[in-house]
Amino acid sequence: MAMFTTMTALTLTSLIPPITATLINPNKKNSYPHYVKTAIASAFTISLIPTTMFICLGQETIVTNWCWTTTQTLQLSLSFKLDYFSMTFLPVALLITWSIMEFSLWYMASDPNINQFLKFLLIFLITMIILVTANNLLQLFIGWEGVGIMSFLLISWWYARTDANTAAIQAILYNRIGDIGFILALAWFLLHSNSWELQQVFLLNNNPNLLPLLGLLLAAAGKSAQLGLHPWLPSAMEGPTPVSALLHSSTMVVAGVFLLIRFHPLTENSPHIQTLTLCLGAITTLFAAICALTQNDIKKIVAFSTSSQLGLMMVTIGINQPHLALLHICTHAFFKALLFMCSGSIIHNLNNEQDIRKMGGLLKTMPLTSTSLTISSLALAGMPFLSGFYSKDLIIETANMSYTNTWALSITLIATSLTGAYSTRMILHTLTSKPHFPTPISINENNPTLLKPIKRLMLGSLFAGFLITNNIPPMSLPQVTTPPYLKLAALAATLLGLLVALDLNYLANKLKTKTPPPTFYFSIMLGFYPSIIHRMIPHLSLLMSQNLSLLLLDLTWLKKLMPKTISQHQTSASITISTQKGLIKLYFLSFLIPLLLILLMIS
C-alpha cells in the first residue's frame, strides 16, 4: 500500500510546480502553456498506476499526513480518502483537463493573458481534486469554495463584457445559497458528532437527522444547478469555451452530485431525503430538456443538456445508486467536453457566431469536428455502445426496477426522449442543412492543438463507458434481472426522441407561417423563471421601497416634523397666549355699526 499512496501523492504534487513557476520566473511566457499541458499529461500518466493498483487490490486507503489544529474536543488533520469514487474520478478529470488545456492553446492563442488563464484552469482542477479526495468536512469545504471562486474568475475572464461580469456574479450568488446549506450541515455535525472526519460522522449518525441532510441537498442543488437554483448554468456560457468545457464536464457542476455520493451512507437511511432528491432530479432533467429544445445558441443547448444530465445523476442518488451516479459522471465528462470543444471549433471558425440558424453545411468543410459532434451528441442521447449508453441505460433500468415514485421515473423517460430530440436538432441545423453563413469565411481545422484533444475525447466518447464498466466494477454489483420491455425502455426512449426530432424538423421546414405558438414561449423564455426572479421581483421590491420611502418622507418630514407641524404649533400657541383672534373685518364692522346708529339718532 505504500506504493499506492506514494504514486497518488506524486500525482497530486506534480500539479504544483506549474503554479509556483510563475512566482519564481514571471517572465517565462512562451514555453509556459506547453509546460502546463505537459505537467497535466504527466500527472494523468502517473495517476493510472495507483488506479490500476486499486482495481487489482480493491482496498481503500485513508492517508493522514499533518494535524492542522487541535482543541480540547476537536482535531483537524490533512486527510485523504482514496477509495472507489476518488480513484475512478481522478484519471478521468486529469485526462479531460489535459485535452482542454491543449485545446486552449489553439482557442486562446490570441489572448495576451493566456498564461494566467491556464494557471486558473489548473487551480480549478486542483480544487476539484481536493474536494474529491477529502476525508474531512473542512478539507472538503476548502475544495468546495475553491471551485466556486475559480468559476467566478474564469466565467468573468472577459471582464470588459457586461454579460460576462453579470454571469459570474449570478453564479457566485446562487452558489452562496447552496453554501448556506453546507455550513448548516457543518455546524450540525460539529455539535452532534464532535468531529468532521467522514468515518466518525457516518458511524455516529446511523439514523441521521433531516436537518443536515436538507442542508447537504441544498448545497448540491446550488452547485449542480438543480431547478430553482439553475439560472447561473446557462448564463455561465459567457465565459470562454474551454472554461465551459471544464466547468461542465469534470469540475464544478458535478461537485454537488459528488457531495451526495460521499454522504450516501447517511442518505440511504433517510427515505425522505431520497424521495426529495429523486423528485428534484426528475423535475430538473425534464425542465432542462424542454428548455434545450428551442434554444438557438449552440453553447446554451449544450449547457441545458448538462443541467438535464445533472438531474439524471440526482435521480440516481435518489434511487440509492451512488456507483451508477459516479459512472455517469465519468462517461458524461468525455462527451460533454467533446461537445463543447466541437462547439468552440465551430464558433471560432465562423467568427464567433453561436446561432445554429446561421450555421449549416459544415459536414464537408469541417469533417473531423462534424464527426466528433455527431458521436458526442449520440453518446449524450444514449445511443447503444457509445459511452453514454453504458451509464444511462443502467440508470433507467435500475430506476424501472425500484419501488419509488412512478411519475418521477416516467418524466425521466420523457426527458431521455427529449435528449435525443434536441441532440438531433443541433446536428441537423449545424451540419446537414444549407450553409447560412457568409461565403468569404475561411474555415480551417488542421491545427494539431485542435485535432489531438478532439480525437482523444472522441475515443473516450466511444470506448470510455465500455472500459470503465468492464474494468472498474463496484465492490458489490447487483444482479439485474428485468423483463425485455423494461430492458429496452431506455433505447426506445432515445430512438423515439430521434424520430420525433427528424419529423418535427421536416414539418418545421414546410410551415407557411413563421409565428411560433404560445406554448413555444415557455421553452424559449426558460419557463419565465429569469423574467420572474431576475426582473419582476427586483422591480416590485424596488418600487415598493421607493413608494415606502417617499410616503414615509412626506408623512414624517412634511406633516409630522417641519412645516405643517410648526404652523400648527404656532397657531395653538397664539390661541393660548392671546385673547385676540385677529378678526379685523369683524372688529371694523362692530365699530362701524354703532357709529351708523349714533349718526341716525343725531340726525
Curated annotation (Swiss-Prot):
**Enzyme nomenclature, EC number:** 7.1.1.2
Broad class of where this protein is predominantly found: mitochondrion
The answer, when asked if Signal is one of the entry's keywords, is: no
Judging by the UniProt lineage, the source's domain of life is Eukaryota
The record's section on InterPro entries has: NADH_DH_su5_C, NADHpl_OxRdtase_5_subgr, ND/Mrp_TM, NU5C-like, Proton_antipo_N
Cellular component terms, GO, for this chain's entry? mitochondrial inner membrane
Q: Where are the transmembrane segments?
A: 4-24, 38-58, 89-109, 122-142, 171-191, 211-233, 241-261, 273-293, 301-320, 325-347, 366-386, 405-424, 457-477, 488-508, 524-544, 582-602
Tell me where in or outside the cell this protein is found: Mitochondrion inner membrane
- How would you describe this protein's topology in the membrane? Multi-pass membrane protein
- Which UniProt keywords are present, listed alphabetically? Electron transport, Membrane, Mitochondrion, Mitochondrion inner membrane, NAD, Respiratory chain, Translocase, Transmembrane, Transmembrane helix, Transport, Ubiquinone
Answer yes or no on keyword Transmembrane.
yes
**UniProt enzyme class:** translocase
The molecular function terms in GO held by this entry are: NADH dehydrogenase (ubiquinone) activity
Q: What is catalysed by this protein?
A: a ubiquinone + NADH + 5 H(+)(in) = a ubiquinol + NAD(+) + 4 H(+)(out)
GO BP field: electron transport coupled proton transport; mitochondrial electron transport, NADH to ubiquinone; mitochondrial respiratory chain complex I assembly
How the protein assembles, per its UniProt entry? Core subunit of respiratory chain NADH dehydrogenase (Complex I) which is composed of 45 different subunits.
Regarding protein family, the annotation reads: Belongs to the complex I subunit 5 family.
**In UniProt terms, what function does this protein have?**
Core subunit of the mitochondrial membrane respiratory chain NADH dehydrogenase (Complex I) which catalyzes electron transfer from NADH through the respiratory chain, using ubiquinone as an electron acceptor. Essential for the catalytic activity and assembly of complex I.
Name under which the protein is recorded: NADH-ubiquinone oxidoreductase chain 5
Q: What organism does this protein naturally occur in? A: Pongo abelii (Sumatran orangutan)
Gene symbol here is MT-ND5
